[in-house]
Amino acid sequence: MKFTIQNDILVENLKKITRLLIKNVSFPILENILIQIENGILSLTTTNLEIELVSKIKIITKYTPGKITISGRKILNICRNLSEKSEVKMPLKEKKMYVSCENSNYILSTLSADDFPNHQNFNHISNFHISSNILKEMIEKTEFSMGKQDVRYYLNGMLLEKKDNFLRSVATDGYRLAISYSKLEKDINFFSIIIPSKAVMELSRLLNTQVQLLNILIGTNSIRIYIKDLIFTTQLIEGEYPDYESVLFKEKKNPIIANCTLLKKSLLRAAILAHEKFCGIEIKIEKNKFKVLSDNQEEETAEDLFDINYLGDTIEISINVYYLLDVINNIKSENIILFLNKSKSSIQIEAENNSLNAYIIMLLKR
């Protein structure tokens, strides 16, 4: 095995995938990168057993095919301290990887590529294409509502499903729910999967690139996404996701229309004196007035009032102020619309003139 590559290209691709490297005393190969070269393509692979990243680079110089694994951190630290435009030569000799560049030479230990756990075979039941900026936005609109180390393991991820010719992303921790829709241009096979939260966060990071068309393959227990020259694969969470549609409001009457900026500033002021543990605030709404009240364990209080558009009956509710702020931070319109359900147990929030995103927050008992 032998190849030559420009250093800045190698470093750029190493940076994309080395976040997955983990220290594992019982499985040390997880600290390594799988390096494989064949058919003019250099593949760099990392995995944490749940997520796998493969970066592919076209090699334009002479090479000898082969595969091996070396320390990911060490090769990245070596190369990032070499001249950007210099050529890095990497031949494999007697189970040692030699790295040479200008006047610098290194010899690295290796582990067999045959012991590296990777998803070589991938059988899919559905596949489709979607713009990276659309998927990125769908993730951003919902990921904050995912469960965090919940015993209901299926909540610790994001639901992604095809339904009624729409792609839907849904996240809930049992106290709040976020949903985002995107219309699919072509009909595809039905699927409904739960992507683990760590994989969702990693995918969101990878989508911080120029807008491009993604190729997404859905497997029975994993999902694979082609992001230009990068391949993202993750295992899925098994289990049945809650019936989120039963939570969405069937009837939306007496809308409460509030300016996003005014509401956010009012909530931030009230949050200063909210209870540190429960984070609850009181909201009173009546005839174009929105009043926010908070108090805490030290018997301190805050009250804030601003104008809204509402002519219905008086409403008094309690809500987690930070759940509400999370929603507002993800709404870009000038105004937002709030609806209260009949049982007064939850509110549904939407952006004005945008029905592709919706948020449900359970109310606190007063």
Curated annotation (Swiss-Prot):
Keywords: Cytoplasm, DNA replication, DNA-binding, DNA-directed DNA polymerase, Nucleotidyltransferase, Transferase. One of its GO terms (molecular function) is 3'-5' exonuclease activity. It is found in: Cytoplasm. It holds the Pfam family DNA_pol3_beta_3. GO terms for biological process: DNA strand elongation involved in DNA replication. One of its GO terms (cellular component) is DNA polymerase III complex. Its main location: cytoplasm. Forms a ring-shaped head-to-tail homodimer around DNA which binds and tethers DNA polymerases and other proteins to the DNA. The DNA replisome complex has a single clamp-loading complex (3 tau and 1 each of delta, delta', psi and chi subunits) which binds 3 Pol III cores (1 core on the leading strand and 2 on the lagging strand) each with a beta sliding clamp dimer. Additional proteins in the replisome are other copies of gamma, psi and chi, Ssb, DNA helicase and RNA primase. Confers DNA tethering and processivity to DNA polymerases and other proteins. Acts as a clamp, forming a ring around DNA (a reaction catalyzed by the clamp-loading complex) which diffuses in an ATP-independent manner freely and bidirectionally along dsDNA. Initially characterized for its ability to contact the catalytic subunit of DNA polymerase III (Pol III), a complex, multichain enzyme responsible for most of the replicative synthesis in bacteria; Pol III exhibits 3'-5' exonuclease proofreading activity. Belongs to the beta sliding clamp family. This is Beta sliding clamp.
